[in-house]
Each structure stands twice: as C-alpha cells, then as structure tokens.
Amino acid sequence: MNILEVQDLCKTYGKGEAAVQALRHATFSVRKGEFIAIIGESGSGKSTLLNVVGALDKATSGKVWIDGQDIFSMPEKKLTVFRRQHIGFIFQSFNLIPELNVEQNITFPLLLDYKRPDQRFVNELLNVLGLTERRHHLPSQLSGGQQQRVAIGRALVTRP
C-alpha cells in the first residue's frame, strides 16, 4: 500500500521572464514502511518538493495523496489538522518552543489535538533519542544536535 503518491508535481516561482521552475513533473510513490532519500545539488528543488508534499506550500500543478487523501483538495482548516496528525516534519531551524522543556516540545503536537500523550511511547522516544536525562531542560540548555533530536521526537510522537 502506498502511503504517499506524487503525480506530475510542478512548482514555479514568479511569473513571465522571472519565472523559475523549481519542480518539473515530479512523480513517485512511497510504500508504507519504506524510506527514501531525496538528494541533489543546492537549488535543485529538494526543499521545495518537501514543502509542497508536506502541504506547507502550494503546487503550481500536479497531485499529492497522503494515506489515500488528496491533500490539495482539502479546505485549509482540515489540511492543518491533517498535516499535524499525518505528517512528521523536521524544520531546518527545528522550531522548538523556547518556554517548553524537551518533553513538552515533543508532546506539543498531541496537545494541539487535545490528545493525551502515551507516556510509555514518549519515554521510549526520549530513550531512543538519548534525551531521557534532558527531558526537563529548555531548548536553550541543549546542544544543536540535542535540539535536532527533540524535533525528531516531535515529528514521530503522533506516529505519522
């Protein structure tokens, strides 16, 4: 079963002579449980592809289905909830909330949906990510690598 399907995806920035085509007819699928790597030179469209597939940016044309849902046909409010519940996204700058500790940052997406965190799973994430001893530390008290691991935990806590 495909968890992600991308068909004929195009993204153009700008108009007329200033137009830059960042994505040209990207088509691929990812089966449930499969991992893929997106590689390419700087400026080749990797971030644009992830932003469009992750519903953070709009495509110029094409289709994206996640778990069988056409994300481009969803109303914005539904898409926001869908993205939070089905897509684990790690931003380059991590986007941790400075006032929340490690555990609170990891469980934050669940709280947005009024879901009680599965403490066993949260503890497992903290352990696997090597953050158990830092669970009550604020982001400012962590190294860059530790902050990245918090962002990974936050992306995985909803079990996307």
Report residues per predicted region.
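ABC family nucleotide-binding domain
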Residues: 2-160
